[in-house]
């Protein structure tokens, strides 16, 4: 397992490879973290998946997260579009990745949808989406408001500091500030769904505190037959951490069935 950094237009992004990319033509699973995530917060799920599939994986922390360069706050409300349509393609170029499966969680899953539907990048062969959002719901805002209170009054800041270091404030406020902005209520990425014509696996916890099953229905309807949806009972917003075995089995079978 190698830790490293890549420079993109003067900004340093933390990356970590699990497994070795021997040939450029080999497929890579690219992990895109949630709104408060980073390389370290994927825990051991990527390594466990690698042991099962033997497909190299790339984890990276977006700017303002983990050990990456800091970012300015407040973020522009199209921050996920910029990540999807500008930063992610640049990262794949810089690392000479020719075939990839995007594995996104929450904001990372939404970024994956925008990237795939907006660019139809031939390098992307499949999407694994955990708890994606395509529009804003009351439950999302309510849970983020609770997180804001915990960050300001509780110990959430201290917990996140262990993973985001000096980025802890720009990581939190970049995320919460955007999602709680009144103008963000209009955020909607359903227009990108019709442009997705590769296989998609969508996994959501039945008890997800950040989104309802309306997200799943919208994505399934928007993408159509290329999308397979799985709802995991007794699970909230992080299936890979809360129900790792069930999630691993679903992901393993899906990726084994892809044509690279």
Indicate residue ranges for each PLM-predicted region.
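Short beta-strand/loop motif that positions the catalytic acidic residue
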Residues: 196, 202-204
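Catalytic histidine neighborhood in serine/cysteine hydrolases
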Residues: 221-238
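Conserved HGGG/HGGXW glycine-rich cap/lid loop of the alpha/beta-hydrolase fold
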Residues: 18-70
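Active-site loop/oxyanion-hole signature of alpha/beta-hydrolase fold enzymes
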Residues: 59-99
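Acidic catalytic loop of the alpha/beta-hydrolase fold
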Residues: 207-211
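Conserved hydrolase catalytic core segment
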Residues: 98-137
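Short alpha-helix in the alpha/beta-hydrolase fold that links the catalytic acid
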Residues: 198, 212-221
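Catalytic histidine-centered segment of alpha/beta-hydrolase-like enzymes
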Residues: 235-244, 248
């Amino acid at each position: 397992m190698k830790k490293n950094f890549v420079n993109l237009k003067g900004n340093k992004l933390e990356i970590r490879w699990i497994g070795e990319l021997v040939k450029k033509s080999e497929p890579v699973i690219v992990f895109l973290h949630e709104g408060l995530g980073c390389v370290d917060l994927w825990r051991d799920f990527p390594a466990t998946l690698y042991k099962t599939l033997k497909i190299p994986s790339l984890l990276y922390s977006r700017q303002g997260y983990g050990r990456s360069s800091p970012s300015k706050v407040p973020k522009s409300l199209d921050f996920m579009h910029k990540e999807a349509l500008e930063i992610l393609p640049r990262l794949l170029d810089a690392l000479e990745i020719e075939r990839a499966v995007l594995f996104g969680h929450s904001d990372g899953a939404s970024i994956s949808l925008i990237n795939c539907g907006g660019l139809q990048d031939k390098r992307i062969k499949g999407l694994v989406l955990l708890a994606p959002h395509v529009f804003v719901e009351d439950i999302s805002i309510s849970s983020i408001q609770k997180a804001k209170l915990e960050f300001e009054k509780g110990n959430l800041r201290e917990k996140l500091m262990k993973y985001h270091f000096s980025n802890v404030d720009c990581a939190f406020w970049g995320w919460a500030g955007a999602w709680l902005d009144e103008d963000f209520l209009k955020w909607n990425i359903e227009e990108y769904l019709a442009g997705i014509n590769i296989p998609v696996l969508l996994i959501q916890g039945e008890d997800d505190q950040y989104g309802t099953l309306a997200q799943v229905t919208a994505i399934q309807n928007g993408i159509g037959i290329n999308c397979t949806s799985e709802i995991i009972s007794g699970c909230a917003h992080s299936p890979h951490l809360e129900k790792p075995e069930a999630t691993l089995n679903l992901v393993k079978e899906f990726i084994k069935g892809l044509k690279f």
